[in-house]
C-alpha cells in the first residue's frame, strides 16, 4: 500500500500535469504541490522541472517512478496470491 504522497507522485508522472493529477485524485492542486514538495524534501532533490512551460521528470523522478511501479506490481501480485489461496481470514 503506497503512501498518499507517493500515489500523488505516480499520478503526476502519469499525466505530467499537477491540475490533472489533482482532478484524478479528487484533491486540490495545492495539495498535489505539497505532496511533491514533501517528497522533494524527503529525498533532497527536485523531482520535476519546467522546460518551456512543460513539466518534465528529473532523473531522480524517473528512478522513483520505476521503483514505485515495481512496488505496486509486487503488491498487486501478493493481493492476487492471497485472494486465490483463500487466505483472507485473519485469526487472532
Name the predicted role of every residue range.
Residues 24-25, 36, 43, 64:
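Core residues of bacterial helix-turn-helix
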Residues 11, 23, 41, 48, ...:
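Regular, well-ordered alpha-helical segments
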Residues 40-57:
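A short LG(V/I)-centered, amphipathic sequence patch enriched
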Residues 12-26:
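Short helix-boundary/capping micro-motifs
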Residues 2-8, 29, 61, 89:
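The N-cap/first-turn positions of alpha helices
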